[in-house]
Amino acid sequence: MCRFFATAPKGLNELLREELTTFGAENIKTQPTGATFDGDLEVGYRSCLWSRLANRIYLVLLETELPNQEALSSVVQSIDWSKHIDKEGTFAVSFSGQGLGITHSHYGALKIKDGIVDYFREHYQVRPSIDTEVPDIRVHGHLNRNQLTLSLDLSGYSLHQRGYREGIQVEAPLKENVAAAILMRANWPEIAQQGGAFYDPMCGSGTFLVEAALMASDTAPGVAKSGEMLLNYWLGHDESLWQKLVEEAEQREQVGLKHLPNIYGSDISHKSLDVARNSIQAAGYDDVIEIKQMAVEQGRKWGDWSPGLIVCNPPYGERLGEEETVKQIYLKLGEYLKAEFIHWKAAILTCHTELGMFLGIKAKRSHDFFNGAMSCRLFRFEIEEEWFRQPALQPKQDLAEQVLQLQPDLADTDNAKMVSNRIRKNMKGLKSWVKQNDISAYRVYDADIPEYALAIDLYDTLESGLWVVVAEYAPPKTVNPTKAKRRLYEAMSVLPSVFNVSPERIVFKVRSQQKGQDQYERLDEQKAFFTIVENQTRLRVNFTDYLDTGIFLDHRQVRQEVAKLAAGKRLLNLFCYTATATAEAVKAGCKSSLSLDMSKTYLYWAKHNFMCNDINEKQHVLQQENVLEWLETATQNPKDLFDVIFLDPPSFSTSKRMDGTLDIQRDHVDLIQKTLKLLSKDGKLIFSTNLRKFKLDKASFEPDYQIENITQRTMPKDYARNMKIHQAWLFSRQ
């Protein structure tokens, strides 16, 4: 078994993991710069031949910890280099990272080179030559503080260099492996297999076209340069295995070419098309890929095209004064797509997310990408009328995007500026508190100006940074609906600039009193989950699929209280929702736990919260139960008692799996009394409710229990403007 490291462009880690799995890789661990994985030599060879995403595949020779810089030479010399490098051959060394006083890559490479040379001089009295341009072998060293990794570069060149663009100068090219990743995200392999066509209406140098053909024909991207890879000069090379894999790849390509779907490209620039023709010819697809000079606004399909996939990378408009020109390009592209490509899929890459609005089609999904150092966004579309943006503003999740497109001047009005100033003032007041407490999700505005009745929450996610969730409190019937809408749009218009976030990451929701099943109503099917950190616990949130996000932010300190009490104890979490309180308690040292909820959806969500924190589900159990029925049974002859119980029931609930209803004001005495039967001798129960007019019947529990109102101490600073958001009590046996 060998250890390998695959480098890849930033942001492709998860796609790379999926790809490496298809090669037979095991123990894959992604990093910002790529992924380590285990496998036999065949897995490494397949990665060199078939990876469409990796830059380089390294065979790891040594991983060790260095006590000091001086130890580097002896560690390098401890490797039997005669198994890897011909003593009469040539080699080169590259180096990355820093540590132990090594801060320059050239110096690190020089130290490793000297160690290899000294090894050969000591054992063979001869040494291989250094050739930094075309060596037989490339050795790579990486130092992370005191952790040294020495590897062989199996290809010797970046695998994104397929060979079809060599010698071709392209302005601001999209790397081949980034283009391949975009095609993967857009599901091109599946579409091609079903016979769908491919079209790039702004094909430029033709990178998408060639990569689409390579994928659709099942061509290994490394096969054309298989003879140039440095693994051919490695002394540990298995020539027969390599030739077998190369022949297999060539056979697969021959079969794949027979089933290649139609691939088309067009561009307004004849110079770009000349470059594209050269690339297409070099790749061997000049009889397969059809290109044509044509502006988007002149666009018409020129043949019988089966519905398939459109992918393009429109101009970014980086130069001063180009913004309006680029906006017009997006408008025309959107008109072209809607007029000619109904029932197709599309994927558009842009580094200015607001430009996507001008296509006039709502994106179904989006993904972060990097074109070099430039942060970009890939928008994926289904070109169906139901996804076309309507000219009138609609109170939907993408309301901020709509306002930006249809009422771009609204943010300059006096009322909008007033809302902006209030939010900025709130943010300034919370800034030090957020930083001191390492808070990544919090409320920044809660109807501070009564006429602008919104709740605005910020979520700083690990995956993609800041998201803004805006909930509107449904206005009373006495309020003029037109005026209420106007105020809503004014508030939404300033949010992108206030939070310095693209409107696509501002999610709007309408709040109203929830009844019965409404509280669990699914709003969408995007299934886009993100991760935040609270009290050193990773928690999964979802901004689009439900009215709620998976975490109640006002309960932040309630969860902290539960976690503190449960350290080293047994915890019962009733109506656990997504079990955020349990996850935080386990991170704080909870010995064992049982978390119950009736919703399969939320328990599945809770399971992912547990997975994010490596929580043992045998020790910490998630169980789907009608909590009221479970309590009825569990309290008849209680055997399992708990040291800490967290009881946070809904204010009102009905369900298909539940007979009758739960009304917390009416039923709280019976519910709490049953729950207390499961409390150990010195146990504690925290009861919490969000019912604003709730009154606790303390007399029903005294004098057997000491009851402490902990509402004020569990109310976080970001909810100080709304002290009725929840109430909480701590029950202790007298």
Curated annotation (Swiss-Prot):
GO terms for molecular function: 23S rRNA (guanine(2445)-N(2))-methyltransferase activity; RNA binding; rRNA (guanine-N7-)-methyltransferase activity. This is Ribosomal RNA large subunit methyltransferase K/L. Its main location: cytoplasm. It comes from the Bacteria. PROSITE patterns: THUMP. Specifically methylates the guanine in position 2445 (m2G2445) and the guanine in position 2069 (m7G2069) of 23S rRNA. GO terms for cellular component: cytoplasm. The keyword Iron-sulfur does not apply. Belongs to the methyltransferase superfamily. RlmKL family.
